[in-house]
Amino acid sequence: MKYCCFLLIIWFLGISGGFAQDKVECWGRYEISIPAKVKGNPFDVELTATFNGPDTTLTVRGFYDGNDTFKIRFMPVKQGGWYYITQSKIPALDGVKGQIECIAPGKGNHGPVKVDGTYNFKYADGTRYYPVGTTSYDWMHVAGNQPDQTVKSLELSKFNKIRMLFFVQNFDPDYPEPSMFPFEIKKITKDEKGKPVYEWDFTRFNPAYFAHVEACVDNLAGIGVEADLILFHPYDGGRWGFDRMPLEAGVRYLKYLTARMSSFRNIWWSLANEYDFLRELKPEYWDTFTHTVVENDPYSHLCSIHTYTAKYYKYWEPEYTHASIQDQAPVE
């Protein structure tokens, strides 16, 4: 009799455990981590997950995060139960199933900003959003405690958006070499002035660099600030060569970035700052880059491209949600 009761208790606990599920707030972030060792370049591995929720199905891309670990990040957009299953040609990554419960958003979480009609913005929960922005190109890449100081200064200000560079900048030739880069380094040589010349492996990323940017974006979300992330910029001058990547390398970078960061509710995509000064990149690249970002962002975050003074891009194209204009004429 005691033995039968013991089996019954074990059976009940097993069934109860089957119904246990992780909880994540609406427009929060849920992360799946799957250990797997693969042959060849792990950044070549294709991994997706399909999430089925209340009247909604979303497919998101996974990514390799180093240390034999693959991850999938998901931002639930409706409250209720969500069920997921992964897809991959790698057996260890394929068919991983689970479920989560999306609960009400916490305090200060209004969801991502969207376009409201033609001329206005609002958060996903319907709260009106009036952008009051600033720019700090490389605040994330400065050594020491300056990134933390920047966040504290923003918290005390009235700004609710900041434009910032994903790649480091070279405005100052004496700007110190960064402690890390977004790509693996194949080789470092010296030029005639003794300065380092880098040869990059654009097929392999440095997850630590991306994780640092992500932590900064999360810190901004914590104080209610939108992160207008500039994906390319002309302020490299060939020092590191991120302003002249081959088309294939640029597309690969954007796919990896969107897989990692589309689930961040406060992210905005700015394809470039003063894109027309990126003269090593062909004009037609920008359509490809834009399509890559939009097609790999299942949440349709705000997307634009910034031009030089009094120049306008094809903002009427459906991929662009708003204009990013550097011109005093519209307000004169």
Q: What is the predicted role of each segment?
A:
Residues 1-22:
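Bacterial Sec-dependent N-terminal signal peptides
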Residues 19-20, 330-332:
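Short, intrinsically disordered, charge-balanced linker/junction segments flanking boundaries
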Residues 22-26, 39-42:
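Short, solvent-exposed loop/linker segments at the N-terminal edge
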Residues 24-30, 66-68:
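Ser/Thr- and Asn-enriched, surface-exposed coil loops between beta-strands
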Residues 29, 44-48, 59:
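Exposed beta-strand and adjacent loop surfaces of beta-rich binding modules
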Residues 32-39:
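Short amphipathic, basic-aromatic surface patches that mediate peripheral association
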Residues 50-125, 139-141:
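Extended acidic/polar, glycine-enriched regions
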